[in-house]
Swiss-Prot record:
InterPro entries: CBS_CbpB, CBS_dom_sf, Diverse_CBS-Domain
Subunit record text: Homodimer. Forms a homodimer with a parallel, head-to-head assembly of the monomers. Under conditions of potassium starvation and corresponding low c-di-AMP levels, apo-DarB specifically interacts with the N-terminal region of the RelA. Under the same conditions, apo-DarB also specifically interacts with the C-terminal part of the pyruvate carboxylase.
UniProt keyword tRNA processing present: no
Protein name (database record): Cyclic di-AMP receptor B
Annotated positions binding 3',3'-c-di-AMP: 23, 25, 46-47, 131
Ranges where the CBS domain occurs: 18-78
Keyword set includes DNA repair: no
UniProt-reported outcome of changing residue 38 to F: Binds c-di-AMP. Abolishes the ability to bind RelA. Is still able to bind PYC, but cannot activate it
Domain characteristics, as noted in the entry: No conformational changes occur upon c-di-AMP binding.
Primary gene name: darB
This protein's UniProt keywords: CBS domain
């Protein structure tokens, strides 16, 4: 069992460690699946946030969701990519964090998710809280305790 002798990290908020919205790839609800697949492929991500024009978070879209929506009985129906919108396929029941949530809440949520979307009081997308950032900060914290 690791003993964290300092409460400094544990008192932090999600907003202090998130990747800000302007650095996060996303699509809008009205975009077609072809555009979403292009963004996912170009960035190398498997899932990205879906926002409306006011930057409100509506859900996530991922490569698997897109591919499942174009599977036909005998072939992949690529021609459907420009006919189906992101909002028809996206996952809406997603974990969310508030920008002022304690970091411990975020720690628990990234156990089962590579990232969790962060929003403010008006459900406006503020960024993502990633497992990578959590592990990086935890590593830095543990190293500082061992000095």
């Amino acid at each position: 069992m690791i003993s964290l002798q300092s409460d400094q990290l544990l008192e932090a908020t999600v907003g202090q460690f998130m990747i800000e919205a302007d650095k996060v790839a996303h699509v809008q609800v009205g975009n077609n699946l072809e555009h979403a697949l292009l963004v996912l492929t170009k960035t190398g991500y498997t899932a990205i946030p879906v926002l409306d024009p006011s930057y409100r978070l509506h859900g996530l879209i991922g490569t698997n969701m897109i591919m499942n929506s174009i599977f036909g009985l005998e072939r992949i129906e690529f021609e459907k990519l420009d006919q189906i919108t992101v909002e028809e396929v996206m996952l809406t029941d997603i974990p969310r964090l508030h920008i002022n949530d304690p970091i411990m809440k975020g720690f628990g949520m990234v156990i089962n998710n590579g990232f969790v979307c962060v929003e403010n009081d008006e459900q406006v997308f503020e960024g993502i809280f990633t497992r990578r950032v959590v592990l990086k900060e935890l590593n830095k914290h543990i190293r500082s305790l061992n000095k």
